[in-house]
From Swiss-Prot:
NCBIfam families: lon, PRK10787.1. InterPro entries: AAA+_ATPase (IPR003593), ATPase_AAA_core (IPR003959), Lon_bac (IPR027543), Lon_bac/euk-typ (IPR004815), Lon_lid (IPR054594), Lon_proteolytic (IPR008269), Lon_Prtase (IPR027065), Lon_prtase_N (IPR003111). Keywords: ATP-binding, Cytoplasm, Hydrolase, Nucleotide-binding, Protease, Serine protease, Stress response. The active site is at S693, K736. This is Lon protease. Residues 20-216 form the Lon N-terminal domain. CDD domains: RecA-like_Lon. Its main location: cytoplasm. It is an enzyme of class 3 (hydrolase). GO terms for molecular function: ATP binding; ATP hydrolysis activity; ATP-dependent peptidase activity; sequence-specific DNA binding; serine-type endopeptidase activity. SMART domains: AAA, LON. It catalyses: Hydrolysis of proteins in presence of ATP.
Length: 809
């Protein structure tokens, strides 16, 4: 056979030109003795076919390495290809720019060079026939082995196995049979190309036979698995048939409960009428089929029946109409709450966007503020303003994740979580959800409810919220969530999903306004009084705020107002008076509420040495903070009293250093610091005090104590100080300035960096105070002290020695 090929090469080589038109193929390898139909669409390839047809119908075909590349170059073509003969050319039925070419492979050939003829490509090649280095008997053996292996493979993998096996049995040439088989197995382009490139015939044949043997082994394993699965399916079908037969017998023999039948019929009717998403309906119908096959009195039937009722009660597609009337919404918010402008603006902004964008994911607002400032009631007002149903979910003390996500149905007494329960209660899928006290959640061995809320509060994830009980995706993207908290003690991942709006607490003027507009009319109505029977004057309300309550919100203020109303009702009932008309003023207020509960911070009338007014921020607002410093003869000891925190103690140390660095300018001899004991005291010792914002006030008080110069009583100051005496920015400026205004202060010193915060200060406060922004303590002392100390005379550091001579170097 090898001699035949060699003779064939000798005879044909002069007949095959060394340069032929080139056809580059995608994902196809053409072997000798192989016929294949090709769809040719590239312009140069079509031109190459035309050139070949006009000469000897011979072309050089070779596979591309990268089939996605449009341009043809030598680097993207394999080294070996095939000289092929064009048998037939037909135009494509549906594409004018494509032709169908039937070719027959003739000889293996090696690509040497590509020549660009402008309109088509040619290939310079060299014929490279394969050699068979085995004797005749071995060839016959290999021929039969390859036929047998291909027959096994074809019967297992190929559709037209009988025709292909018959065709293979007719082939007597081993080389031709090898190429015939290689074209019928699903090998990738790299492996098929390797078959063409093998110089040794035996290696080519062995690779192909190994592949066929591996495929036969895989087929045997697959057949074994198929038989095993078939036997198991027959067993399962038999068990299913027997179980169904048993259920039918049980239904016939059991005493059927009419009420249970009615329940099933009712569920079937509701299921047919319900508006359910496709995935929910499929699940519900599957569960209903199970229910009909069960005995109605069984516990399993009760579980399935409850599950179906929850599905049918859940508002999957029912939504309430959301109001987008901005003016009406603003009126409702203003009528229900005084102040809280940031929150109102955010709600109105959301409604404005919703009026333009029909589909908008609900915002996640988190209102953080002290108790009693109206966080929860604000949620109700927002629901009313937007036309949404209102749902309040208290999270205080919740420790179990199942409270949020529900229990799985496998547990006895399982039920859905509070999210699904609340939606079922209101009957719509777009309510306003108020998650109250979100900072009060805890965790234990039952799970972490805060982590369960991560999915609920993420707008990009809550469209597919999965409750453990339902085990179905529920869309929460149209729910508007508002969370409330007293502090920022919220898990970081949860906090990141929310837009935090801080409610710092009401100012004194805001509390008075709220009492006049809301609390007093409410107390009169709730206690059965008529408006003309009780009048509480503004100065009395202000007195209640200052001397009977100390809070950031208005709850205690409401209690005190209600207390007055109850006493008035008692007086009216006891006297049986029909024309009762009482005025509550600042003068007669103690008759109703008793003596004052709190001292109202007021500035001193006289200037004192070592005593200065600081300004403090507390959870219930701002206060005047008196700072007292006494300097007495001693040994340089430093004493602090008044329940001071570590930060304030460090601030005192810093202030002392600031004074010592300015000792000469302030007229303080250096020895004074070693011979004087300093005592810093902040009155109301039972109240803990901390923070760095008293630095400027402490420095001023220390200067006054060491110099003996008094400090003006009508000034106050706030600000942290650096070692160089620079005034540094502080927080809570609004509350502090309100306290200064309330306490009769005339001049307030604030750091220069806090000027930007003055925009938040009410105009009546700014008009009643002289606010001076300073950069350092040096700007405060001339205005705060009643007089400036005289600096010490400057003395040279080194005194000259009489008669000394200049040093020589």
């Amino acid at each position: 056979m090898s001699e035949l090929i060699m003779n064939e090469k000798t005879d044909l080589e002069p007949q095959v030109p060394s340069v032929l038109p080139l056809l580059a193929l995608r994902d196809v390898v053409v072997y000798p003795h192989m016929q294949i139909a090709l769809f040719v669409g590239r312009e140069k390839s079509i031109n190459a076919v035309d050139v070949a047809r006009n000469s000897d119908n011979l072309v050089f075909v070779v596979a591309q390495k990268d089939s996605l590349t449009e341009e043809i170059d030598h680097d993207n073509l394999y080294q070996y290809g095939t000289v092929a003969k064009i048998v037939q050319v037909v135009n494509h039925e549906n594409d004018e720019n494509c032709i169908k070419v039937l070719i027959e492979g003739l000889h293996r050939s090696k690509l040497k060079k590509i020549i660009d003829e402008d309109s088509y490509l040619t290939a310079e090649h060299e014929l490279s026939p394969m050699t068979i280095n085995v004797d005749k008997a071995t060839q016959e053996t290999r021929l039969q082995e390859l036929r047998n292996l291909f027959a096994q493979y074809a019967e297992a993998k190929l559709r037209n196995a009988r025709e292909l096996v018959a065709a293979a049995n007719k082939i007597e040439d081993l080389l031709q049979l090898m190429f015939f088989v290689a074209t019928r197995v699903p090998l990738n382009i790299e492996i098929k190309q390797k078959f063409l490139e093998y110089d040794e015939f035996e290696a080519h044949l062995q690779e192909l036979m190994n592949y066929l043997m591996n495929q036969s082994a895989e087929q045997q394993i697959e057949q074994t698995l198929h038989d095993s699965v078939k036997r198991q399916m027959e067993k399962n079908q038999r068990e299913y048939f027997l179980n169904e037969k048993m259920k039918v017998i049980q239904r016939e023999l059991s005493d059927m409960n009419g009420g249970a039948e009615d329940d099933v019929a009712e569920i079937e009717k509701r299921l047919a009428e319900a508006d359910l998403p496709e995935h929910v309906r499929k699940k519900a119908e599957a569960e209903f089929r199970k229910l009909k096959a069960m005995q109605p009195a069984s516990s399993e039937a009760a579980v399935v029946r409850n599950y179906l009722e929850v599905i049918l009660d859940t508002p999957w597609n029912k939504a309430s109409k959301v109001s987008i009337n901005l003016n009406k919404a603003q009126e409702i918010l203003d009528a229900d709450h005084y102040g809280l402008d940031d929150v109102k603006d955010r709600i109105v902004e959301y409604l404005a966007v919703q009026s333009r964008v029909k589909k908008l994911k609900g915002p996640i607002l988190c209102l953080v503020g002290p108790p009693g400032v109206g966080k929860t009631s604000l949620g109700e007002s927002v629901a009313k303003a937007t036309g949404r149903e209102f749902v309040r979910m208290a999270l205080g003390g919740v420790r179990d994740e199942a409270e949020i996500r529900g229990h799985r149905r496998t547990y006895i007494g399982a039920m859905p979580g509070k999210i699904v329960q609340s939606l079922t209660k209101v009957g719509v899928k777009n309510p306003l959800f108020l998650l109250d006290e979100i900072d009060k959640m805890a965790q234990d061995y039952r799970g972490d409810p805060a982590s369960a809320l991560l999915e609920v509060l993420d707008p990009s994830q809550n469209s597919k919220f999965n409750d453990h009980y339902l085990d179905l995706d529920l869309d929460l993207s149209e729910v508007m969530f508002i969370c409330t908290a007293n502090s920022m003690n919220i898990p970081e991942a949860l906090l990141d999903r929310m837009e935090v709006i801080r409610l710092p607490g009401y100012t004194e003027d805001e509390k008075v306004n709220i009492a006049e507009r809301y609390l007093v009319p409410k107390a009169i109505k709730n206690n059965g009084l008529r408006p003309k029977e009780l009048t509480i004057h503004e100065e009395a309300i202000r007195d209640i705020v200052q001397r009977y309550t100390r809070e950031a919100g208005v709850r205690n203020l409401e209690r005190e107002v209600s207390k007055i109303a109850r006493k008035v009702v008692k007086e009216a009932v006891s006297k049986k008076s029909k024309n009762l008309q009482l005025d509550v003023t600042s003068a007669n207020l103690p008759e109703y509420l008793g003596p004052h509960k709190f001292d109202f911070g007021m500035a001193e009338d006289e200037a004192q040495v070592g005593r200065v007014n600081g300004l403090a921020w507390t959870s219930v607002g701002g206060e005047l903070l008196t700072i007292e410093v006494a300097a007495v003869k001693g040994k340089g000891k430093f004493i602090t009293t008044g329940s001071l925190g570590d930060v304030m103690k460090e601030s005192i140390t810093t202030a002392m250093t600031v004074v010592r660095t300015r000792a000469d300018e302030l007229g303080i001899e250096a020895s004074r610091f070693e011979e004087t004991d300093v005592h810093v005291h902040l009155p109301e010792g039972a109240t803990p005090k901390d923070g760095p914002s008293a630095g400027l006030a402490l420095t001023t008080a220390l200067v006054s104590a060491f110099t003996g110069i008094a400090i003006r009583p009508d000034i106050a100051m706030t600000g942290e100080t650096s070692l160089g005496g620079r005034a540094m920015r502080i927080g809570g400026l609004k509350e502090k300035l309100l306290a200064a205004h309330r306490g009769g202060i005339k001049l307030v010193f604030i750091p220069q960096d806090n000027v930007r915060d003055l925009a938040e200060i009410p105009d009546n406060v700014k008009e009643g105070l002289e606010i001076k922004a300073v950069k350092s303590i040096d700007e405060i002392l001339p205005l705060a002290l009643t007089s400036m100390p005289k600096p010490l005379p400057k003395t040279p550091i080194v005194k000259p020695v009489e008669g000394s001579k200049a040093a020589r170097h």
